[in-house]
């Protein structure tokens, strides 16, 4: 992750946390994700947690729980709603379980490439999606990033959704 992206990420997270309520004693927060400790999502989460603690003079102490240590992606999404987890890294397919419209970003062949997806994330349409998600769930989306696309492998080549007609495939629990 580029330095500016890291800084923007930490600032967004810090601003959201600081705006969350009146001054008080240190708050301990749980940040969960499903990625292994060698993955950039984990290393940047640890970095952001340290930056947030530093920039808020210790007001927020965030412990990062990697590698599904607090549950699978479905579990940590439910944990956000239940209040057992404070922050997560998750994808639109899981958010769509609570607010189906936001799942559009997960459909195959919706975006031409990563730049197209990032342009969507800065659009009024995406703002409408995250506002609707927040109204429905009470959960605020702080940042959006491109981590690559899912891939489908088969013995038959296809370049669009029509080419997948009739294929029997296994899919993750999304």
Write out the residue ranges for each language-model feature.
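Alpha-to-beta junction loops
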Residues: 57-61, 76-90, 168-170
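Extracytoplasmic "Venus flytrap"
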Residues: 30-47, 67-72
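Short helix-initiation/N-cap motifs at beta->coil->alpha
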Residues: 65-78, 157-159, 172-174
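Bacterial N-terminal signal peptides that target proteins for export
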Residues: 1-11
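Sec/Tat signal peptide C-region and signal peptidase I cleavage site
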Residues: 18-25
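Generic structural signal for residues in well-ordered beta-strands
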Residues: 62-64, 141
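Contiguous mixed-secondary-structure segments that line small-molecule binding/active-site clefts
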Residues: 49-50, 86, 91-174
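Signal peptide-proximal N-terminal region
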Residues: 47-62
């Amino acid at each position: 992750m580029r330095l500016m992206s890291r800084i923007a990420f930490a600032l967004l997270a810090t601003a959201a946390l600081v705006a969350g309520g009146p001054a008080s004693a240190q708050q301990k927060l749980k940040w969960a994700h499903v990625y292994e400790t060698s993955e950039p999502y984990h290393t940047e989460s640890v970095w952001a947690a340290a930056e947030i603690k530093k920039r808020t003079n210790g007001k927020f102490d965030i412990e990062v729980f990697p590698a599904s240590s607090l549950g699978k992606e479905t579990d940590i999404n439910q944990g956000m709603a239940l209040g057992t987890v404070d922050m997560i890294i998750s994808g639109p397919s899981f958010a769509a379980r609570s607010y189906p419209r936001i799942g559009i970003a997960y459909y195959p062949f919706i975006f031409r490439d990563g730049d197209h997806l990032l342009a969507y994330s800065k659009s009024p349409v995406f703002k409408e999606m995250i506002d609707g998600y927040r109204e429905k769930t009470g959960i605020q989306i702080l940042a959006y990033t491109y981590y690559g696309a899912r891939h489908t492998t088969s013995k038959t080549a296809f370049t669009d959704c029509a080419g997948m007609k009739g294929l029997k495939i296994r899919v993750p629990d999304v």
